Amino acid sequence: KRGEIFTNYFTPELDNGILAPTNTSLLNIFLTESTSDCRFTPFWIRPDNGKYSFRCFHKYEAPEESDPFFSYLVPMIRISEMFYIVAETTDDETEARTCLNLVRRNRGLVAFEDTEMVDIQQVLKEEYMKEFFGEGQLFFYYKRLNVSSIPAGDDSGMITMDEAKYKFPLPDSETDYRN
């Protein structure tokens, strides 16, 4: 099933229904077309088929030469996510900065200087947007923090959120046979 994600939703070969952010939305996430950020260049590719001028999401494209077993593994938690959790929950700004810098350096980005003023929560939000794109983790980050508005996938602005929008309805198969 996971192997169909790319071909059903993200491949540049689709005519209709392709899921892709606008160039402006993508640049709002990555702040620039950064060739140094390893989360940008391999996953966001501008197709050479002449069909689209925007970048398409290739994170779930099956590698041509790889063991299919490893292609479909999804980690329960990533080491980067653990560093983000520490950065978010610690009261020690130096520890938070150290955790963020460790991930940033390993993603090809410049570390924050010790004297640089950094809004840890804002940086965390930006890092979540880059690190977990297409995985659903960002939704749960927003839900956990009860964020009242989230960026729309297009250039239309923000989507207002409330408790009801953060809850998914239970499928009938989960409720049909309950007492």
Say what each PLM segment does.
Residues 1-20, 33-179:
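Acidic/polar-rich alpha-helix caps and helix-coil junctions
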